[in-house]
UniProtKB/Swiss-Prot annotation:
It comes from Ruthia magnifica subsp. Calyptogena magnifica. ATP binds at K197, E314, G340, G341, D342, T343. InterPro entries: Phosphoglycerate_kinase, Phosphoglycerate_kinase_N, Phosphoglycerate_kinase_sf. The gene is pgk. GO terms for biological process: gluconeogenesis; glycolytic process. The keyword Calcium does not apply. Substrate binds at D21, L22, N23, R36, H59, R60, G61, R62, R113, R146. This is Phosphoglycerate kinase. Transmembrane segments: none annotated. Its main location: cytoplasm. It holds the Pfam family PGK. Keywords: ATP-binding, Cytoplasm, Glycolysis, Kinase, Nucleotide-binding, Transferase.
Length: 391
């Protein structure tokens, strides 16, 4: 990746506009999870230390575009930033005409999606954002797969467009995994449907040594082996695709599973061989023998990419597979990277964050990178670094 890096620039007295991912959960006007906010702090501190005028922008939630509302306001984020930075971070509601501020100050611009044209990457809106700054910093990997005004358009027209430390670190870690992985390379792809992860499965099958499937996805592969999956979530129309993937790549399909009769927290768990699932069963986790097999694979791996749980880990009786898998990844000597919302929830739940080498902040962006797709927000930074002029 050849882009301009924030760390290489003189920020003194400059107007620095930083696009961050501050899309956090909020309840009763209080931030309930501040991980993304804390992840943004080093970049902010770098700019403040150099005496820049620091403007932050982010989206939050899915408001009706162009219609400001308290429900999706970033005010609670500004409050939490003020606490973490030990300085006042004011929320700027009317910011498109420029922000009056002093060197060494930081303001948070209200939700970018309150501006009509944000999602459509409107050129006029992008130019107005660009006029606000001397330097635009893209530091939100989680939105890098979206070509929107605050992630892409502004980078076309800002005097300087660069990558922040968070984005650079993310791309470096993912590049390490995909470009020159230590072998054997193992990928775990979980989730409910093959159809939503089909491109990822196809892309990874070409580069990994073993492809582990979990969750509802695994049911389609079990069915592809000719076994009954009962009432389990299964995409029978994709069985031919599952068979092809198994021909192209080593895919250890579960040999035993944990079933229930209904999807509920109180459902009774029954462990069965994959060959013995009855018509009224629903598969919710992998069984103990399959867990042992996966733990051994993790132990011997050189590189691990983890995207998605292997069972319904929200219900304790169906959580053993994901719990044991997570701990096996944590204990492995392999270089490990985890990404995706459900995956990160599992990492949190089992307290293994410090033992995963890299935790990706992106959901959709993480998947699209694994698919080999070009991320628009990164591509525009590369174009600007190479001298392409959009003015």
């Amino acid at each position: 990746m050849s882009v301009i890096n924030l760390l290489d620039l003189d920020l003194s007295s400059k107007r620095v506009l930083i696009r961050q991912d501050l899309n956090v959960s909020i309840s009763n006007w209080i931030v309930t999870s501040d991980k993304r906010i804390k992840a943004s702090l080093p970049t902010i501190k770098i700019a403040l230390k150099q005496g820049a005028k620091v403007m932050l922008m982010s989206h939050r939630g899915r408001p009706i575009e162009g219609e400001p509302s308290d429900e999706f306001s970033l005010q609670p984020v500004a409050d939490r930033l003020s606490e973490l930075l030990n300085t006042t971070v004011r929320l700027e509601k009317d910011w498109l005409n420029g922000v009056q501020m002093n060197n060494g100050e930081v303001v948070l611009c209200e939700n970018v999606r309150f501006n009509a044209g944000e999602m459509a990457n409107d050129d006029n809106l992008s130019k107005r954002m660009a006029l606000m700054c001397d330097i635009f910093v893209m530091d939100a990997f989680g939105t890098a797969h979206r070509a929107q005004a605050s992630t892409h358009g502004v980078a076309k027209y800002a005097p300087i467009a660069c990558s922040g430390p968070l984005l650079s670190g993310e791309l470096d870690a993912l590049g390490k995994v995909l470009d020159n992985p230590k072998r054997p390379m193992v990928a775990i792809v979980g989730g409910s449907k093959v159809s939503t992860k089909l491109t990822v499965l196809e892309s990874l099958s070409k580069i990994v040594d073993q492809l582990v499937v979990g969750g509802g996805i695994a049911n389609t592969f079990i069915a592809a082996q000719g076994f009954n999956v009962g009432k389990s979530l299964c995409e029978h129309d994709l069985i031919p695709m599952a068979k092809k993937l198994m021909e192209d790549c080593e895919i250890p399909v579960p040999t035993d599973v944990v079933c229930g009769k209904e999807f509920s927290e109180t459902a009774e768990a029954q462990t069965k061989a994959s060959t013995e699932v009855s018509d009224d069963d629903m598969i919710f986790d992998i069984g103990p023998e399959s867990i042992k097999q996966l733990a051994k694979i993790m132990e011997n791996a050189g590189t691990i990419v983890w995207n998605g749980p292997v069972g319904v880990f929200e219900f304790e009786q169906f959580a053993s597979g994901t719990k044991t898998l997570g701990k096996a990844i944590a204990e492995s000597d392999a270089f490990s990277i985890a990404g995706g919302g459900d995956t990160l929830a599992a990492v949190d739940k089992y307290g293994i964050e410090d033992k995963i080498n890299y935790i990706s902040t992106g959901g959709g962006a993480f998947l699209e990178f694994l698919e080999g797709k070009i991320l628009p927000a990164v591509e525009i930074l590369e174009q600007r670094a190479s001298g392409v002029d959009f003015a």
